[in-house]
Amino acid sequence: MRFSKLFMSAALALTMSAFTAMAGKPEAERWINSEFQPSAFSKAQQMAEMEWFIKAAEPFKGMEINVLSETIPTHSYESKVLTKAFEEITGIKVNHQLLGEGEVVQAVQTQMQT
């Protein structure tokens, strides 16, 4: 629970950037047809969900999100694959830093004190 709160605090640290990206349905379709298969959802259901993400992300396109996570296999996959998908689909760049558990706790505590 404590780690979840720390992770969420780190994930919510947003910064503006001059970054622009192509984002939208063609990118979502490409990810749905490749990395996001197999799925319990049909491709049409996945696309409906992606359309919601695209629309919800529109006001934030061009922003940059800094995420700090513990180095575990799930977070490594998120950092290497899902951050790229998220950026291509939403136009929001993700900087995903992976550290050991103690380093994550220390980094978040330092950030909270500043």
Question: What is the predicted function of each stretch?
Answer:
Residues 1-8:
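Bacterial N-terminal signal peptides that target proteins for export
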Residues 22-114:
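Conserved N-terminal structural module of periplasmic/extracytoplasmic solute-binding proteins
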Residues 9-18:
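Bacterial N-terminal signal peptides
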Residues 5, 18-23:
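N-terminal export/targeting leaders of redox proteins
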